[in-house]
Amino acid sequence: MSWQAYVDEHLMCDVGDGQGHHLTAAAIIGHDGSVWAQSANFPQFKPQEITDIMKDFDEPGHLAPTGMFLAGLKYMVIQGEPNAVIRGKKGAGGITIKKTGQSMVFGLYEEPVTPGQCNMVVERLGDYLIEQGL
C-alpha cells in the first residue's frame, strides 16, 4: 500500500460517527520533515515547526509555554502521551500527532468531529505503523 493510500483510506476516512464526518486534513511526515503523503488541503508547514514538534517528543513539555505552530497557526498543547502523542487545540478544532519509529501521523479536525474521534483515527494508524516497524 502506498503512503498516499494510508492517508486517503485510513486518515481521511469516515470517523465512525455514522454521519460521514472526516478529518479536515492529514499527513504522514518523516522525522526529518519530509512529506511521505498528505491530503490535498494539508497546510504548508515550515521546517522549524516540524523541528519543534520533534523536540517536544524528545523533551515533553517543550511546546507547552509557547504553543505548537503548524503553517503559522498556533495550537494550545493539551494532554498527550510523552514520546508518543501530541495533541493541540485551536478554536473549534485541533490536531493530533502520533510518533512512529520513522514518521509522524498528523490529523487535523474541526467541529463536528471531536478530539476523541481524531485521536482514534490518527492513533489507530500510528499504532499499526509501529507494529509494522515503521
Curated annotation (Swiss-Prot):
GO terms for biological process: actin cytoskeleton organization. It is found in: Cytoplasm, Cytoskeleton. Specifically expressed in mature pollen grains. Expressed in germinating pollen grains. Expressed in growing pollen tubes (at protein level). Disulfide bonds: none annotated. One of its GO terms (molecular function) is actin monomer binding. InterPro entries: PFN, PFN_euk, PFN_sf, Profilin_CS. The keyword Transmembrane does not apply. It comes from the Eukaryota. The keyword Zinc-finger does not apply. Disruption phenotype: In germinating pollen grain, the double mutant prf4 and prf5 reduces the amount of F-actin and induces disorganization of actin filaments within the apical and subapical regions of the pollen tube. PROSITE patterns: PROFILIN (PS00414). Keywords: Actin-binding, Cytoplasm, Cytoskeleton. One of its GO terms (cellular component) is phragmoplast. Occurs in many kinds of cells as a complex with monomeric actin in a 1:1 ratio. Belongs to the profilin family. Binds to actin monomers and regulates the organization of the actin cytoskeleton. At high concentrations, profilin prevents the polymerization of actin, whereas it enhances it at low concentrations. At low concentrations, associates with the poly-proline motif of formins to enhance actin filament elongation rate. Acts redundantly with PRF4 to regulate apical actin polymerization at the tip of pollen tube and control polarized pollen tube growth. Functions probably by favoring formin-mediated actin polymerization at pollen tube tips. This is Profilin-5.
